[in-house]
């Protein structure tokens, strides 16, 4: 819970800075790349959690990573600040929170669309258009297949689920029949 509060504080500051400089998307891309490098490299994560490494050594490791990733100056300074404050371990949570706050700032939603069968592009675009019209926001859908739905679509937007799957409809009919 503490890490969530810390992540939110850092992410919020970076979103505000990105918004002021019109660099929200660039920051997002750079943070995803750096976070991906950390996620894929256990030794790198261990180095930042290891007290045997001095603060200067950790800063140099981060500088090398920043140079390889060709991060912007603002993201580079942000990452070095995380090293200074010993918050690099919070990077995954910061990036996740940044994405959510950046989407809110930009008016973007990322619904999860689950169907029983794979959708073609025209079907995804039709659902996307309907959601954009309903929400008034830009929609960036994520689509997955779950054959247990039998048919229909389940759309999850944050905490709200729109379930028009055959599986759910059959379950409702079953409940009605059992209750009499």
From Swiss-Prot:
<keyword id="KW-0406">Ion transport</keyword>
<comment type="similarity">
    <text>Belongs to the ATPase delta chain family.</text>
</comment>
<keyword id="KW-0139">CF(1)</keyword>
<keyword id="KW-1003">Cell membrane</keyword>
<dbReference type="InterPro" id="IPR000711">
    <property type="entry name" value="ATPase_OSCP/dsu"/>
</dbReference>
<dbReference type="GO" id="GO:0045259">
    <property type="term" value="C:proton-transporting ATP synthase complex"/>
</dbReference>
<keyword id="KW-0472">Membrane</keyword>
<dbReference type="GO" id="GO:0046933">
    <property type="term" value="F:proton-transporting ATP synthase activity, rotational mechanism"/>
</dbReference>
<dbReference type="Pfam" id="PF00213">
    <property type="entry name" value="OSCP"/>
</dbReference>
<dbReference type="GO" id="GO:0005886">
    <property type="term" value="C:plasma membrane"/>
</dbReference>
<dbReference type="InterPro" id="IPR026015">
    <property type="entry name" value="ATP_synth_OSCP/delta_N_sf"/>
</dbReference>
<comment type="subunit">
    <text>F-type ATPases have 2 components, F(1) - the catalytic core - and F(0) - the membrane proton channel. F(1) has five subunits: alpha(3), beta(3), gamma(1), delta(1), epsilon(1). F(0) has three main subunits: a(1), b(2) and c(10-14). The alpha and beta chains form an alternating ring which encloses part of the gamma chain. F(1) is attached to F(0) by a central stalk formed by the gamma and epsilon chains, while a peripheral stalk is formed by the delta and b chains.</text>
</comment>
<keyword id="KW-0066">ATP synthesis</keyword>
<comment type="function">
    <text>F(1)F(0) ATP synthase produces ATP from ADP in the presence of a proton or sodium gradient. F-type ATPases consist of two structural domains, F(1) containing the extramembraneous catalytic core and F(0) containing the membrane proton channel, linked together by a central stalk and a peripheral stalk. During catalysis, ATP synthesis in the catalytic domain of F(1) is coupled via a rotary mechanism of the central stalk subunits to proton translocation.</text>
</comment>
<keyword id="KW-0375">Hydrogen ion transport</keyword>
<keyword id="KW-0813">Transport</keyword>
<keyword id="KW-0997">Cell inner membrane</keyword>
<comment type="function">
    <text>This protein is part of the stalk that links CF(0) to CF(1). It either transmits conformational changes from CF(0) to CF(1) or is implicated in proton conduction.</text>
</comment>
<protein>
    <recommendedName>
        <fullName>ATP synthase subunit delta</fullName>
    </recommendedName>
</protein>
């Amino acid at each position: 819970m503490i890490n969530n509060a810390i992540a939110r504080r850092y992410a919020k500051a970076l979103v505000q800075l990105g918004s002021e400089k019109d660099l929200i998307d660039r920051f997002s891309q750079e943070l995803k790349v750096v976070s991906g490098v950390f996620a894929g490299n256990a030794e790198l994560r261990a180095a930042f959690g290891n007290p045997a490494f001095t603060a200067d050594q950790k800063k140099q490791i981060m500088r090398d990573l920043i140079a390889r990733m060709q991060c912007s100056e603002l993201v580079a300074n942000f990452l070095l600040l995380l090293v200074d404050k010993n918050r690099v371990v919070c990077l995954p949570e910061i990036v996740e929170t940044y994405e959510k706050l950046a989407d809110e700032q930009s008016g973007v939603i990322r619904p999860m669309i689950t169907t029983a069968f794979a959708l073609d592009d025209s079907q995804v675009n039709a659902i996307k258009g309907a959601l954009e019209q309903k929400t008034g926001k830009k929609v960036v859908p994520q689509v997955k297949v779950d054959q247990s739905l039998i048919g229909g679509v389940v759309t999850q937007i944050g905490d709200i689920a729109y379930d028009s799957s055959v599986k759910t409809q059959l379950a409702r009919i079953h409940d009605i029949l059992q209750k009499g």
